[in-house]
């Protein structure tokens, strides 16, 4: 950084090697859909002695969403896993899992819903401080996990002109 209020971002001085693989799978049975994904990421800083892993890049990420949907309802349950990461100082973080649930009822006029995100309340503040230093001179460590924790929302998607017929087979039953 140039000063406490100005920063310069620049490219890495030499090569970064990134290898990996990602897979996404979808299973469907009647009104059920199950999505699974996994990513393996091996990104190394070739210009640093020992070729350490790139900071804030988890080697393993996975997710799963199970969705039930028909013309009247949409219900979804999700699980996401983020593997351990390294911070810029070489410290290894905790891995974590987040869970979510969505329930939505469809009507001609719209769709009320209730949504629970990260209902296991996984957040960085449970593992390490999010702010260091003093009130007048705060220091913000790297962010590697959710900062919000549990989020609960209730809402309505309003369709002022009525519900449009969907051509998707999940709504035709």
Annotate each language-model stretch with its function.
Residues 18, 59-63, 96-100, 149-151:
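Transmembrane beta-barrel architecture of outer membranes
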Residues 23, 101-103:
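Short, basic/aromatic-rich helical patch in the C-terminal catalytic core of site-specific tyrosine
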Residues 14, 55, 92, 145-146:
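Aromatic-acidic/polar surface patches that form glycan- and anion
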Residues 105-173:
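C-terminal beta-signal and adjacent terminal beta-strands/loops
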Residues 95-96, 108:
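Strand-loop-strand
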Residues 1-12, 78-90, 121-139, 143:
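Surface-exposed extracellular loop regions of Gram-negative outer-membrane beta-barrel proteins
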Residues 81-85, 100, 107:
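Short, well-ordered turn and helix-capping elements at secondary-structure junctions
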Residues 3-87, 157-159, 166, 170:
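Gram-negative outer-membrane beta-barrel transporters
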